[in-house]
Swiss-Prot record:
Organism, scientific name: Corynebacterium diphtheriae (strain ATCC 700971 / NCTC 13129 / Biotype gravis)
Gene3D superfamilies in alphabetical order: 3.30.590.20
EC number: 6.3.2.2
Protein's recorded name: Putative glutamate--cysteine ligase 2
Stretches of the chain forming a coiled coil according to its record: none
Catalytic reaction(s) noted: L-cysteine + L-glutamate + ATP = gamma-L-glutamyl-L-cysteine + ADP + phosphate + H(+)
Family under the similarity heading: Belongs to the glutamate--cysteine ligase type 2 family. YbdK subfamily.
Length: 359
């Protein structure tokens, strides 16, 4: 893989879906929105989905403003079609068996290969790209970012419902997506050469021929970025906080390397446990924070991160967005709001209404 060095620029991909405000079910008309929009939109795996894609941005506010303008256009087009826009990690009752995949050879091949699990990918996420100055820094930074996996997932967890039930998870999307053979946690490679050898193996074995790429939760890209794919899709306010935290964390890690500091890491088994805890318990997760298996509440860790990173956030122009992390800690994440409504009403319909209203 070619990896061109990049300054710490930023790009964001935001997956959203179309919903019928009467039935509250999903509607496979994403291609119609894309055809009418001037905003940069991409087709995604599902025909009900559109993906908003920013340009290469220098600051979080710049990226968020592009997304704000884009989502307003998408909402207006959807409204003309009698539809609304859905932004969450999954849908609480839409039948994945009845939601068609986009007609694209790559996607159809994934379905053919993965069968039952591939058909269940009724999920949406947020992908954040941050530029990295050297390919030799990519894997130290990715391995360090894995220590912050539960922080980012808990903030955005928005998929408690699935197939008509409360799963008990904050992010059922996370549990579903890892069922695909090329998805899930990356291996903690120790060098760029080791990564290239791994990718050569995947090419030789035909894995990449079937899937187009590896779909790790954090991965390098040919654009000179590290792509963080941890977060559930959610509303723009909570997305802004997660993007700001991601940008600050990666820039902070780059600067630690500049100073010759060793970056934090966790054992693979701790990383996997933290991922599960955040998916299960969200903002109520107790997470592992050291190689000695010390633990802390994810909300306490988030507050500490905001305090530590706030000076850097001012420098990067995303101080206000980073403070949104504290708001989520105080008022709750999307999955908590959804679950509270479901427990109160016993129905997913008002839950869908509430999520649609947040857009």
């Amino acid at each position: 893989m070619i990896f061109p060095p990049s300054p710490p620029t930023l790009g964001v991909e935001w997956e959203v879906a179309l919903a019928d405000p009467h039935s509250r079910d999903l509607v496979p008309r994403g291609h119609e929105v894309i055809e009418k929009a001037t905003t940069h939109l991409e087709r995604e795996f599902l025909a009900n989905t559109v993906e908003l894609v920013t340009s290469v941005c220098t600051t979080v506010p710049e990226a968020i403003e592009e997304l704000r303008e884009g989502i307003e256009e998408v909402k207006a087009i959807a409204a003309d079609m009698g539809l609304k826009v859905w932004a969450a990690g999954s849908h609480p009752f839409s039948d994945f068996r009845k939601q068609p995949v986009n007609e694209k050879g790559h996607y159809n091949e994934i379905i053919e290969r993965t069968q039952y699990w591939g058909n269940q990918m009724l999920i949406w996420g947020i992908h954040v790209h941050v530029g990295i100055s050297s390919k030799d820094r990519v894997w130290p930074i990715i391995n360090a970012m894995l220590t912050y996996y539960p922080h980012l997932l808990a903030l955005t967890a928005s998929s408690p419902g699935w197939d008509g039930i409360d799963t008990g998870y904050a992010s059922n999307r996370t549990m579903l997506y890892q069922q695909l053979p090329t998805a899930g946690l990356p291996y903690q490679f120790q060098s760029w050469d080791e990564w290239e050898a791994y990718m050569a193996d995947q090419n030789k074995s035909g894995v990449i021929n079937h899937t187009g790429s590896m779909h790790f939760d954090i991965r390098p890209t040919r654009y000179g970025t590290v792509e963080v794919r941890i977060c559930d899709s959610t509303n723009l306010r909570e997305l802004s906080a997660a993007v700001a935290l991601t940008h600050c964390l990666i820039v902070d890690l780059e600067r630690k390397l500049d100073r010759g500091e060793e970056l934090p890491t966790l054992q693979d088994w701790h990383v996997a446990e933290n991922k599960w805890r955040a998916a299960r318990y969200g903002m109520d997760a107790e997470i592992i924070i050291s190689r000695d298996t010390d633990e802390a509440w994810v909300t306490d860790e988030l507050r500490s991160l905001v305090e530590r990173l706030s000076p850097l956030a001012r420098e990067l122009g995303c101080y206000d967005e980073l403070q949104g992390v504290l708001t989520i800690c105080q008022t709750g994440a999307s999955y908590q709001r959804q679950r509270a409504i479901y427990k109160e009403t016993g129905s997913w319909l008002p839950v869908v209404d509430a999520v649609l209203a947040e857009m």
